[in-house]
Swiss-Prot record:
It comes from Chloroflexus aggregans (strain MD-66 / DSM 9485). GO terms for biological process: methionyl-tRNA aminoacylation. This is Methionine--tRNA ligase. Its cofactor is Zn(2+). It is found in: Cytoplasm. It catalyses: tRNA(Met) + L-methionine + ATP = L-methionyl-tRNA(Met) + AMP + diphosphate. It comes from the Bacteria. Keywords: Aminoacyl-tRNA synthetase, ATP-binding, Cytoplasm, Ligase, Metal-binding, Nucleotide-binding, Protein biosynthesis, Zinc.
């Protein structure tokens, strides 16, 4: 029975292009997971979009003398193009400035407010001393009063995990201009997190399958749980849906509150765009559905504490949660099943910094290198369980010594020889024990790699796939069919047949990681149809007449299945080309020089 799998991907912020450190944390792992489950025949809904509200976008707009909407429009397109070129197979990649998102966000706010889970409190708001604008909590840094860490943020300390307010910090300073923020009394709306403390604690304690850092960080956060502000004094954001704010433009819903709601609103938009307005309920109100959230470690508590609290408070209520007389009447929205958090990626030993030039944007990278080469590196050497460093030397080494030399070499030597000598899948003779052993080992990879992917252990899964490819290379080197063919044509045909079967099975195993090259290999092997593409953009017109673009794909047409090869004898091959490019080591110095030029 196919499972319903929600793949909820962190929303990239639309105040600039995204760099490779961003997609290492949220994009590539989520796509690997989604592609695997589609190959398994499960019903996958992968959603996200650009996060387009808040002060950072207004700061960029002010600097350029334009509007926040213009900035959001620009970077929504740039980011969408980058994710398309990287092959991230969203069912819907949308944005938070749609009428649909506003409606869902306001419904959740209103429902929580009516149920007493949103309360009013007077507090000290942080404002920039130079611009007078509200400073987001994450734009304020200072010393943690509990552990002394001097780069604690205005919302939490990443060193000790404590929940903080900007006023808690010692010597707070603005990340915008380095000046101390100005604190002014102001009334805000707060999400009453302590009201959910016991439920959250019991629920998180039961999540034994979570990564230890996610579970421990979340439990630690619960120790000092307090109401969290969900509005800010600014003009750019989702309006507060209360009558007294109908004609006010000075206070909006805080960006973090509306961003996490985006997973739900994007699912609802997908259903509307597909002509099945209630189809989203199959994922959100189906007790058997499983929700997987992907993000960097700096967003853990938003997905393990704050968003679950909002879901618990909303339940099956409101305009969207209720399904009167329907299949899911009275069934609450589902909580996360797993929260897959990645660590941080650095670059040449330094923290990514756009302002300091220590960065390589996705679009810049893909203008010179293949997407699968980047996907390979970010998986095999990425920050899955610990902070890792991207260096150009390591990227070139991994590409040449692993991707090209192992998997690329196996495909090239097998297909080029078979195409030259047979032109189609050859008729094998009797299989020897050695033949059967290598076939069995690669076939077993469907299970072993699949188990690792299902557990979100992407690095180990890719390493196992590469080990299997290496075993087939060893088999060919020992059997030497290029020599055997001179004296025993049938035996050579058998060896190449076994190798082709292994390559065909490995093609499926590598597809979640390397979709572009896997699709080309699929075609070289003589197959038709898609196992990994294409993606597409679609223009959507809302009821208010506004249009926006979504990244999506017709994944129901994909023909690949997570099964061993059934490559038929006699299938005509297409002329193969090498799957991957070997990189000249001179690119290391060229790229380091580019980085140095950005540093000035």
């Amino acid at each position: 029975m196919p499972e319903h799998i929600l793949v909820a991907v962190a929303w990239p912020y639309a105040n600039g292009p995204r760099h490779i450190g961003h997609v290492a944390g949220f994009g590539v792992p989520a796509d690997i997971f989604a592609r695997y489950h589609r190959l398994r025949g499960n019903r996958v809904l992968m959603v996200s979009g650009t996060d387009e509200h808040g002060t950072p976008i207004t700061l960029v707009a002010d600097k350029e003398g334009t509007t926040p909407q213009a900035i959001a429009d620009r970077y929504n397109k740039i980011i969408g193009d980058d994710l398309y070129n990287l092959g991230l197979s969203y069912d819907t990649f949308t944005r938070t400035t749609t009428a649909n998102h506003y409606a869902v966000t306001q419904d959740i706010f209103r429902t929580l407010y009516e149920r007493g889970y949103i309360i009013r409190q007077e507090t000290l708001g942080a404002f920039s001393a130079t611009t007078g604008r509200t400073l987001p909590d994450r734009y304020i840094e200072g010393t943690c009063p509990l552990c002394g860490y001097d780069e604690a943020r205005g919302d939490q300390c990443d060193n000790c995990g404590s929940q903080l307010d900007p006023t808690d910090l010692i010597n707070p300073r603005s990340k915008v201009d380095g000046q101390p923020p100005v604190f002014k009394p102001t009334e805000h709306f707060f999400l009453d997190l302590p009201a959910f403390a016991e439920q959250l604690h019991d629920w998180i304690n039961r999540q034994d399958h979570w990564r230890p850092n996610v579970r421990n960080f979340s439990l630690n956060f619960l120790k000092d749980l307090k109401p969290r502000a969900i509005t800010r004094d600014l003009e750019w954001g989702v309006p507060i849906p209360l009558p007294e704010y109908a004609n006010r433009d000075d206070k909006k819903i805080y960006v973090w509150f509306d961003a996490v709601i985006g997973y739900l609103s994007a699912s609802i938009e997908w259903a509307q765009n597909s002509g099945q307005p209630d189809a989203w309920r199959e994922w959100w109100q189906n007790p058997d559905a499983r929700h997987f959230y992907f993000m960097g470690k700096d967003n853990i508590v938003f997905h393990t504490v704050i968003w679950p609290a909002m879901l618990l408070g909303y339940g099956a209520g409101g305009q969207f949660g209720a399904d009167p007389g329907g299949k899911y009447d009275g069934i609450p929205l589902q909580l996360p099943y797993n929260v897959v958090s990645s660590e941080f990626l650095t670059m040449e030993g330094k923290k990514f910094s756009s302002s300091r030039g220590i960065v390589i944007y996705v679009n810049d990278f893909l203008s010179r290198y293949d997407a699968d080469a980047l996907r390979y590196f970010l998986t095999i050497a990425g920050p899955e369980n610990q902070d890792t460093d991207f260096t150009w030397a390591e990227f070139v080494r991994r590409n040449n010594d692993e991707l090209v030399a192992t998997w690329g070499n196996l495909v090239n030597r097998t297909l080029s020889n078979v195409y030259k000598n047979f032109g189609s899948v050859p008729q094998p003779g009797p299989l020897t024990p050695v033949d059967e052993q290598v076939l069995a080992e690669v076939t077993g990879g469907i299970e072993t790699v699949g188990e690792l992917l299902a557990a979100a252990r992407f690095k180990a899964a890719l390493a196992e796939a590469m080990r299997l490819a290496a075993q087939v290379n060893i088999y060919l080197s020992e059997q030497e069919p290029w020599k055997v063919i001179k004296s025993d044509h049938e035996r050579a045909a058998t060896i190449w047949y076994v190798a082709l079967r292994c390559v065909d099975t490995l093609k499926i195993i590598f597809t979640p990681f390397l979709p572009f090259s896997s699709q080309r290999l699929h075609e070289y092997l003589g197959y038709n149809g898609y196992i990994a593409g294409p993606l597409t953009f679609r223009e959507v017109t809302e009821a208010n007449g506004r249009t926006h673009r979504v990244l999506t794909g017709d994944y129901d047409r994909w023909v690949g299945r997570w099964e061993p090869s059934v490559l038929p004898v006699g299938q005509v091959l297409r002329q193969p080309q090498p799957l991957f490019k070997k990189l000249d080591e001179k690119v290391i110095e060229e790229e380091l020089a580019r980085m140095q030029s950005r540093l000035g």
